[in-house]
């Protein structure tokens, strides 16, 4: 998108550039992206956000050496609060985690402390982190968003350019409280334009939203270039702008890349996100 072109924060990223893998711990590999880059275009300010929320990351490829040199593995769960100044750029996150591979740590607690310290410093805000042994996940089933899937509609689409106007005039006077789900969300990385595949849950209370128009709107992200977190905030903003629901939650879970998946959520009401893996995760 042209509104990001020339921004120094993006030009400094390792994303889209040839990089070397570091096998010893290096916190400087982490890179943050100011959330304001997207929020300025939506007229959102840090001191008056219309939502709360977080960016939930799952770290599947985390390994280090114990004090005897024996490799250790874990799966990590990280959540950045939506109020952090920066989001974490995913390639830098991957490179940072790889730097643990040949580094010795005395115990798991020190690894957790190190990760939390570095991610908090990069995000410039509140971060929660927990490491789990692999056994923690062996009995966890694949789940699905609970809601009505809107994907199987007999409609024809031939335009895949982003257009928020699909939501204009999309409500009726019927008041509802419902949860809608689509697995057709696809956008592209802001820098590399690599595809990002996701499922999205939209939970709202207010005037009924036309499901065909909502699906056309979501499909219009198909050639849109933004980070995962930015797309979710844009969806939240556009639904609030055009549909004016009393309450709204938008929660997307994306497929993993480089051993990481990103699952942003934004809400203006009480909401606790389920963190179970979806079928494509």
UniProtKB/Swiss-Prot annotation:
Catalytic activity: 7-aminomethyl-7-carbaguanine + 2 NADP(+) = 7-cyano-7-deazaguanine + 2 NADPH + 3 H(+)
A Pfam family the protein falls into: QueF
InterPro entries xrefs: GTP-CH-I_C/QueF, NADPH_dep_7-cyano-7-deazaG_red, QueF, QueF_N, QueF_type2
GO molecular function per UniProt: preQ1 synthase activity
Taxonomic superkingdom: Bacteria
An individual GO BP term: tRNA modification
Localization in the cell: Cytoplasm
Record-listed NADPH binding positions: 90-91, 257-258
Gene Ontology, cellular component aspect: cytoplasm
Active site: 189, 196
Pathway: tRNA modification; tRNA-queuosine biosynthesis
Keyword terms of this UniProt record: Cytoplasm, NADP, Oxidoreductase, Queuosine biosynthesis
The protein's assembly and partners: Homodimer.
Family label: Belongs to the GTP cyclohydrolase I family. QueF type 2 subfamily.
Protein task: Catalyzes the NADPH-dependent reduction of 7-cyano-7-deazaguanine (preQ0) to 7-aminomethyl-7-deazaguanine (preQ1).
Protein name: NADPH-dependent 7-cyano-7-deazaguanine reductase
Organism of this sequence: Proteus mirabilis (strain HI4320)
Annotated gene: queF
